[in-house]
């Protein structure tokens, strides 16, 4: 949700799963609309974080996202959870970077670094999303 707030210029939105409900005849009987919890950060802070996350993709550990037909912001990471075990890897981000449509979070347990494991998984998901829905 934090990444989506960055994508929304600092506004934290309430998550929802259902766009609308239809009756048997296919008529919409209830429509769900996006609504905000409120400002999580200033628009300037969100813009600065977007820039930093874009740099992760352009020159940092988010290299799996480079060369996509869409722009991506992201942050990779790893989390230790038990001595002697492989770390959890993760990637969070949103795309397109300039007019976000989708936020993503990938967590791969006991798999290593975020740049090597989670980011390539996120790339596959985003590639399929944009192939189906366009930019």
What are these regions, as identified by a protein language model?
Residues 1-36, 44, 53-135:
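Active-site beta-strand/loop architecture of penicillin-binding DD-peptidases
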């Amino acid at each position: 949700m934090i990444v989506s707030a960055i994508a929304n210029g600092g506004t934290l939105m309430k998550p929802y799963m259902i766009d609308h409900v239809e009756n048997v005849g296919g008529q919409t009987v209830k429509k769900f609309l996006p609504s905000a919890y409120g400002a999580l950060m200033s628009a300037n802070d969100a813009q600065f974080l977007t820039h930093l996350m874009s740099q992760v993709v352009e020159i940092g550990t988010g290299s799996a996202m480079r060369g996509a037909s869409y722009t991506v912001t992201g942050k990779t990471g790893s989390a230790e959870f038990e001595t002697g075990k492989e770390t959890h890897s993760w990637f969070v981000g949103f795309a397109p970077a300039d007019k976000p449509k989708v936020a993503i979070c990938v967590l791969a347990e006991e798999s290593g670094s975020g740049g090597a494991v989670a980011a390539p998984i996120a790339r596959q998901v985003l590639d399929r999303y944009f192939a189906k829905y366009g930019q």
